[in-house]
C-alpha cells in the first residue's frame, strides 16, 4: 500500500505502525511517531492499523549544539 512517510510517498507491506517501523529498520522506543497527525505512543504502535494514503511521521532524537 502507498503511505506518505516523513513527506515521501512509499510503497510498503506493513499493516500496523509497529510492523512499518520494523520494515523500515527503525528500532527503539525512543522514536516519536504520528499517524495522520496524531501522536502514537510506543505501546500503541502494534494496534495502530495502517490504510492506503495514511500520513506517517517518524522522528528520532538528534544531538544539538
Predicted regions and their residues:
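Ubiquitin-like/PB1-type beta-grasp interaction modules and other compact soluble beta-rich domains
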Residues: 1-64
Amino acid at each position: 500500500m502507498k503511505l506518505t512517510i516523513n513527506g515521501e510517498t512509499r510503497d510498503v507491506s506493513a499493516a500496523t505502525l509497529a510492523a512499518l517501523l520494523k520494515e523500515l529498520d527503525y528500532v527503539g522506543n525512543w522514536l516519536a511517531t504520528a499517524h495522520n497527525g496524531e501522536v502514537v505512543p510506543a505501546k500503541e504502535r502494534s494496534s495502530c492499523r495502517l490504510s492506503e494514503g495514511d500520513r506517517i511521521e517518524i522522528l528520532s532524537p538528534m544531538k544539538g549544539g
